[in-house]
Structure formats: C-alpha cells, structure tokens
C-alpha cells in the first residue's frame, strides 16, 4: 500500500487554532522559527502575509522549498538555514513570530523567547506551540529530542518571564488529540522510531518534524476523503470549548511584545 503525506486530525486542529489566534492580531510580516516542512508558513502566506522561515535542518528546508515554491518564486517568502539563536540581532523585524514544536527542544526556554522577541516590532505578537501536560511524557518525547512538556501554567510563566504582555495560553485539539494520544504512541512504537533513542538530542530534533510514520503522519491517498478541513470542521468547533482549560496535550501560547 502506498502512503502519502496527509495531515492528521491533530494537525488540522492546530492549524485552525492558529487561524483563530490570528483573527485578533493584525500584521503583514512573520518569522517562522523552526519552520520544518513549512506547513504553518504556508497557512500564513495563504492568508496574505509575507515571511521568513528559519530551520537548522537542511532536509526540512528542502521540503519547505517545495511546499512554498509559489510564494518563494514571487518573493513573498524566503528560507534561512541556521539556528535562530545564532542569527544577528538585525536579521529582521516582523509583526508576528511563530514557533511550533520547537521550544521544548531548547534548554533555556526564556532565553529562546527573548531571542525571538528581538525580531518582533513593538506591539507585535509571538505565538508558541509546545507539547502540553507533563503527565503525558512518553516514548515519543524521548525519540524526538524533547527536553520537557508544558502544563498550562508553565507556558504562561515562561512567556511572562520573557517580559511579554497580554499573555494567553490555549489548550489545542481537545478532545481529538487526547483521544488519539495512545493510538499515536502505539504507531510510534511499532514504526521503529525507538531506535532514535541512541541519537543525540540535536539529531533527534533535526528529524522531529519530518517523520514518515504510517497512519500517523502518512496515510493512503484515499484518506483525504476523511482528513480534510471540511469533514473535520466539527472538531474545530468542539476544541474552542476547551481553549481556556489545562487539558491540552498541545498548548499554544500567545503574547504581545511591549
């Protein structure tokens, strides 16, 4: 059976939560820190924003180059190979910085946010996505280079320690991701991902966002009939009821740069 890249339900929920967050935040330019294959950058470019994606994984940037080829060709988007922590202070100034499933890989998370803050204009916004709930630490965290998971209060505190204001933290994908959590772990275990436990944290991190795991990140092409934004719309409505709870195994933090 041939498998192709199709976003799983949790990714659709994450993307919809980002759309919800953007409704209250203006801006025309963005920086995607740890852009991976570029799927969230594409969402922002589709919405008319102009941006830059940064990642230290050459393989991830190859995928992002293909994903965002039309926007790259017309100058609406560009890619930068490298670690954001090594970029100069004058690298860019944008209205919005996003970073999804990156900060949990970084030892100094407050310093990470302060670095990103340098690239956001005063009055601009930062949106951070991280694995939620410490009690959900699992094999998957140990194979993709995670250092920690965040309870809702943890993420709120880190954003405030970075001297950001108008802080808000949402639980994302509840109950969809929660219900699929153990199934997802089973798929990870049977895929051979456990072999990555012998890799360095950086090696694990480089491939964390571009894994091909059958029935988790890749599916038979016919599954598009089920996994699409239209058919999954009821899940988006339901997740909004849980944004202000601490139940999410994915947390999204939003804050303003003073």
Show which residues each predicted segment covers:
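Conserved N-terminal segment of class I S-adenosyl-L-methionine
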Residues: 1-92, 96, 100, 244-255
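A short His-aromatic
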Residues: 101-105
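S-adenosyl-L-methionine-dependent methyltransferase catalytic module, highlighting the catalytic core
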Residues: 2-12, 39, 85, 107-115, ...
